[in-house]
Amino acid sequence: MLNLKFVRENPEIVKQNIRNKFQDRKLPLVDEVIELAEQARATQTEADELRANRNKLSKQIGALMAQGKKEEAEEVKAKVNADAERLKELEAKESELNARVKEIMMTIPNIIDPSVPIGKDDSENVEIEKFGEPVVPDYEIPYHTDIMEKFNGIDLEAAGKVAGNGFYYLMGDIARLHSAVISYARDFMIDRGFTYCIPPFMIRSNVVTGVMSFDEMDAMMYKIEGEDLYLIGTSEHSMIGKFIDTITPESELPKTLTSYSPCFRKEKGAHGIEERGVYRIHQFEKQEMIVVCKPEESKMWFDKLWQNTVDLFRSLDIPVRTLECCSGDLADLKVKSIDVEAWSPRQKKYFEVGSCSNLGDAQARRLKIRVQDENKKKYFAHTLNNTVVAPPRMLIAFLENNLQADGSVKIPKVLQPYMGGKTEIR
């Protein structure tokens, strides 16, 4: 969410940013919110004047009564009562105006970083760099579920009966591999100085609207019926929420957390949920990382975060590349985002396995996450998040890139301690 003062003083910058994100339908909202904010301010001024006048008249009533001027006191009382009625009207109007201002401000997108390429959707994202040499072996790479089924490692049919499309049972060495990857990712991030965290898997609505846009909320979140609770779509939501309504001394920043959690997503309107396999599903597990830092450090942390993901995948012998997300592919709260994609030898192309985002002060402003410097001055922090690893999507890349000619799957050295010393799955 932008600062209203910034919108009021820079309407053309805000409008151009909206155009850059190809959200022209939102252009009228800029002038509307400025006008509504002005009305709210004028209403507040009138209400403040009435309150001051009421206090003044109340003192007059006491003085008049003391002087025995009861009739005059009653006239002043009538004026006070009339002002009280008008004050109620003004307070209701001010509340209504402020609610509408907040509603609009929540829909106006954050100002994107100048380095973000302009484009309509993910087809216009820009490749930055490749890490590792993509290999296409001279033997066939089966579909990922076929590989898993060979090892009796997945049961989609039973999951479909129990929960419907978008769910799975993992078993045996495939389930063990899934857990091994999560455990390795956890230790990988702890070794890089992040504090390990297991967060709540449900959050309240004020946290949901603090970390994401209404459109994202509708497309992703499962609501608990009869409760003000939602299942998390990613642990970023509850980890960032940990700092709601806090003021952190500048000396205690940055806050760097890495967390494990199950994730639940409706994937409303998402292509692929009906397809066979585990690429796009309603429930999965993920290791995530977040940073809460000073504004001047967020760009530095952004580069560190996505590099962590690249380094982890390379340690597992999986080639990856990074893509700069274009303006139209950025969610409204994001300033800048980079996708990490893994190589698929079967498809002979890359596919998304993680995303790193800098949200500037958008989440902090919504959730009131503030910092206090040594002079007691308070300001909003910057927040960032990044996927460390998200099985089972990551398992697709792992199985394809480590499948051997005889149909066995090689286990990289770094994972072998988490697999009971196994060097391969057969």
Please describe what each predicted stretch is.
Residues 27, 130-426:
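TRNA-recognition modules of translation machinery and tRNA-sensing kinases, especially anticodon-binding
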Residues 1-134, 149, 153:
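N-terminal alpha-helical targeting/anchoring segments
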